[in-house]
Amino acid sequence: MDVTITQLENYLSNHYSGRATEQSMFMKLIEEIGEVAELLNKRAGRKASDGSDLTLELGTELADVIHYAVAIAAINGIDMNDIIIRKDKTASIKYQHKINLETFIKQQALA
């Protein structure tokens, strides 16, 4: 099953509506980023690992990062689809990318 950003925003807006603040979501986001950093250190050998599947754990923690980042947007009524497309257009020009995200998506739809 694929999940769109809009679906995730709607779900998280519904889930956190009236019961979470952007500050509490931000603190959770920072905690999860710390867990990603710890896993990256384990993968690089800078920190001991218990032999578990670090790739799976990394994916799980990255999902948590996405969850809380999108939750902050959702409780503030920010349309991340629009923001991501606009931000990528700006970055594509700034960093001289051959193609931007919007064009890529349109080309994929035609293929």
Q: Language-model segments: which ranges?
A:
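Flexible "arm" and connector segments at domain edges
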Residues: 1-62, 66-111
